[in-house]
Amino acid sequence: MVWAPVAVAVMHFGFGWRILDRERVRRRYREVRAGSDAPLIVCANHLTMLDSAVIASALGSPGWYLRHYSSLPWNMPEWRNFGSSRTRRVLVYLMKCVPVIRGGDRRAVARVLARIRHLASRGEVVLIFPEGGRSRSGRVDVGNAAHGVGRLVGSLPGCQVLCVYARGEGQTETTDVPARGERFRLRLSLIEPTSDARGVRRSLDLSRQIVGELGRLEREVLREAA
């Protein structure tokens, strides 16, 4: 956990990033974690390569994560960016990352999802971007729901989904890194998606419910910022 305060210090002092109403966000996350033992998947919109770090720092402090390590979300970075060497693989594991190759071999992706499912079933929190990649338009693409997240949620009985919408005040489009001095607005919504469909249709239905909720949160944030 040594990396956590270092990462927060870099974001806060190095880049000058701020989370607006941070204590409200953290209080809500603590309530969610204390309110149920059900599996929890955090699903978020995706605008930059550092969204996972921004969201993790918004949901809890390094000290709180040290006492509640299972609440620090696992995430799935692109293998080509982070998993290309043994040293990097060790580092990303310590940082609670399970690298995945986007658009790679289905069996390899299935193994990653199985690992993520195992972690979630044991009480670990997992962070996923249900649109499957960074938004090209800078907005949530409600029609671009990846069925993988729906399959994961559907395979975990009673699974809850914490939808997290995060956006920098100056963010108008997709970028690699948020701007220096950026201030982030976050909205959280806890849902439990259900579907009577079966197979792939069920997975897609669950995914669309999640992305649809992110779209609703986006509209709230944009109205507030206007």
Task: Give each language-model segment a name.
Residues 19, 75, 97-99, 161, ...:
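Conserved beta-strand scaffold positions in the cores of enzyme catalytic domains, especially
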Residues 1-18, 84-96, 110, 178-181:
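Alpha-helical membrane-targeting segments
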Residues 34-104:
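Catalytic core of membrane glycerolipid acyltransferases/transacylases, capturing the structured
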Residues 22-31, 56-63, 194:
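Short regulatory "switch" loops immediately downstream of catalytic or recognition motifs
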Residues 38, 106-226:
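Non-catalytic C-terminal accessory region of glycerolipid acyltransferases
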Residues 9-39, 190:
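A short, well-structured juxtamembrane/interface segment
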Residues 10-20, 102-107, 138-140:
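Short, flexible loop segments at the rims of nucleotide/cofactor-binding pockets, characterized by
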